[in-house]
Amino acid sequence: MEIRRRPPNPKVQVAHLEYAVPDQDSEPRNILEKIVWEKDREIAVARERMPLEQLRRKVADLPPARDFLGALSAAAVRPAVIAEVKKASPSKGVIREDFDPVAIAKAYASGGASCLSVLTDKAFFQGGFNVLIEVREAVDLPLLCKDFILSPYQLYQARAAGADAALLIAAILTDQDLAYFAKVAAALGLTVLVEVHDAEELQRVLALGGFPLIGINNRDLTSFETDLATTETLTAQFAEQLLEQQILLVSESGLFHRADLDRVQAAGAQAVLVGEALMRQADVEAALQSLIHG
């Protein structure tokens, strides 16, 4: 299903008044579209508060980004683990009440994570760039900014907050967006993790080329249902192309036990992204070690 980037009849603001013409298509058709529409509004507000030029100056003073892809490639364990710092989600609500991102990040680092993923979406995941900044100051592992990126502006936000990599979701971006955003990310020193969920999206990304790190999301973002068979099906269908382009494949979502990791690794995933399974445990370090070593 095509995801509309903004409402067909957006609200218009005149002075202190806001109005819109009601229309049957004015409501989002699924969760992902709802998130995208809200994100579009958030970006507009953020750009007013901090113009791009200010972000450029911040980024210019930063040390080089850490090698996210290199850390996954060189991981001592397989599959390599990207451990996620996540407080909540649209489908599960609050996942961790006692949310201390610094303590969680340090536990992940001690527990054997190769990289970390940090949710920066505030409206639906209760994250934020402030969380990313806190985690960056606490650990030395490469960090992924996990958000719904619709504008190059967000890549600057991610880098300014200390990210070493950024997520690009194929379902909400055109081919032109993917190619352009990848160039902007490269200029900023950011690694790109391109996320796909179905054969059409993976075919698009492989046809574009130049994306050595691809994530297969086992969660359908329109319904938030998960199925590990998604990784198995897509890796089998595109095995030759994935090998030819030397893709490092990440399986994302729905991974709760060592058997789940073994299953997606057998399908061809060299890394996994795990969040909820760890965030629900009192001792996240022990939970991560158990997931890695069984």
UniProtKB/Swiss-Prot annotation:
Its EC number is 4.1.1.48. Disulfide bonds: none annotated. GO terms for molecular function: indole-3-glycerol-phosphate synthase activity; phosphoribosylanthranilate isomerase activity. Keywords: Amino-acid biosynthesis, Aromatic amino acid biosynthesis, Decarboxylase, Lyase, Tryptophan biosynthesis. GO terms for biological process: L-tryptophan biosynthetic process. SUPFAM superfamilies: Ribulose-phoshate binding barrel. Pathway: Amino-acid biosynthesis; L-tryptophan biosynthesis; L-tryptophan from chorismate: step 4/5. The keyword Transmembrane does not apply. It catalyses: 1-(2-carboxyphenylamino)-1-deoxy-D-ribulose 5-phosphate + H(+) = (1S,2R)-1-C-(indol-3-yl)glycerol 3-phosphate + CO2 + H2O. InterPro entries: Aldolase_TIM, Indole-3-glycerol_P_synth, Indole-3-glycerol_P_synth_dom, Indole-3-GlycerolPSynthase_CS, RibuloseP-bd_barrel. Belongs to the TrpC family. This is Indole-3-glycerol phosphate synthase. The lineage of its organism: Bacteria, Bacillati, Cyanobacteriota, Cyanophyceae, Synechococcales.
